[in-house]
């Protein structure tokens, strides 16, 4: 860990980002710092640390899934509604939003070298660094990892293997995979090198992305999106590699989630085409998922009505943000 921290790099430039008010329309600004970590496989992982306006000992380490980068958690369009990071900062929690290797501002290695196992190791090392204290921030006593889809699988494996976090937020995750819906999404993938958005970037053929104009059907409930959100989502779409999927999917195989011994919140959309029957309601999801978790997980669930796979970007995402705040307040 000392070697890891030795190479930890933090930028010297701080950016002030307006917070999202819960009651005050002009809250103090949040302080955000660009940071980077060495990736276990080589290269660097880019991240942004944001502190709330009041002192806190709790931090959420957030990583996006495939098809997304940091913008999923730190959404630039109508941030007062859709920016999850800002909502958590406004609630008094620190956040560290991390780009997976191969995405965002992180290093892009050959696509075949990307795996969920590599992301698990990276997340584990980041958690250790956060626990000891990042430059410009005190050590955090409580660390909650948060994932979406693929990175929820990463968070599961990290927590069940290393037992070094205090809570786990899983979104776009369940043990009820809709095979037909999943295959329909996969059918919209194509080589990023063939996509106008990534042409000329020198990406190898293994890097994939969604075909233009397919994200509404893939990740949203029918009509459950602001046109500006969808346009921003298409404009900020990300690449990924199918080599990240096989070991990522082991997170849904017994006994993986049963080994998590800290509080867990699962959030899904009722119209998520990747989820079969479990996502019909909060109660249904709780009943379906309960056998896969031990009592120490104190499992909570929340289903966002009408939302597709990307709950951060649904019209009613504020209800999901409120559910997360309630869970954090109750458990930590």
Predicted features by range, described:
Residues 54-93:
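Short, surface-exposed "cap/lid" segments of acyl-processing enzymes
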Residues 113-136:
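Alpha/beta-hydrolase active-site loop
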Residues 141-177:
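Conserved hydrolase catalytic core segment
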Residues 297-332:
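Catalytic active-site module of serine/aspartate enzymes centered on a nucleophile-bearing elbow/loop
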């Amino acid at each position: 860990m000392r070697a890891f921290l030795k190479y930890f790099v933090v930028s010297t430039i701080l950016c002030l980002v307006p917070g999202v008010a819960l009651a005050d329309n002009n809250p103090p600004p949040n302080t955000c710092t660009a940071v980077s970590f060495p990736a276990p496989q080589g290269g660097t992982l880019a991240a942004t640390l944001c502190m709330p306006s009041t002192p806190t000992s709790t931090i959420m380490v957030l990583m996006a899934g495939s098809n997304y980068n940091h913008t999923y958690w730190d959404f630039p369009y109508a941030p007062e509604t859709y920016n999850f990071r800002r909502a958590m900062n406004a609630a008094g929690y620190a956040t560290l939003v991390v780009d997976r290797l191969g995405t965002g501002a992180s290093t892009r290695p050959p696509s075949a070298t990307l795996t969920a196992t590599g992301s698990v190791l990276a997340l584990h090392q980041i958690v250790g660094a956060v626990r000891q204290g990042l430059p410009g921030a005190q050590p955090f006593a409580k660390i909650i990892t948060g994932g979406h889809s693929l990175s929820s699988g990463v968070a599961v494996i990290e927590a069940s293997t290393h037992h070094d976090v205090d809570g786990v937020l899983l979104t776009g995750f369940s043990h009820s995979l809709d095979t037909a819906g999943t295959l329909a999404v996969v059918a919209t993938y194509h080589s990023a090198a063939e996509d106008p958005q990534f042409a000329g970037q020198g990406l190898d053929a293994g890097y994939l992305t969604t075909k233009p104009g397919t994200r509404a059907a893939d990740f949203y409930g029918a009509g459950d999106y602001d046109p500006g959100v969808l346009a921003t989502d298409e404009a900020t779409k990300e690449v990924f590699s199918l080599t990240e999927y096989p070991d990522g999917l082991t997170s849904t195989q017994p006994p993986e989630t049963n080994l998590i011994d800290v509080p867990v919140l699962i959030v899904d959309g009722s119209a998520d085409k990747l989820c079969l029957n479990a996502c019909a309601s909060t109660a249904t999801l709780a009943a379906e998922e309960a056998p896969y978790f031990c009592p120490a997980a104190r499992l909570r669930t929340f289903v966002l009505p009408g939302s597709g796979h990307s709950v951060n970007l649904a019209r009613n995402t504020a209800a999901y943000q409120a559910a997360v705040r309630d869970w954090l307040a109750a458990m930590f």
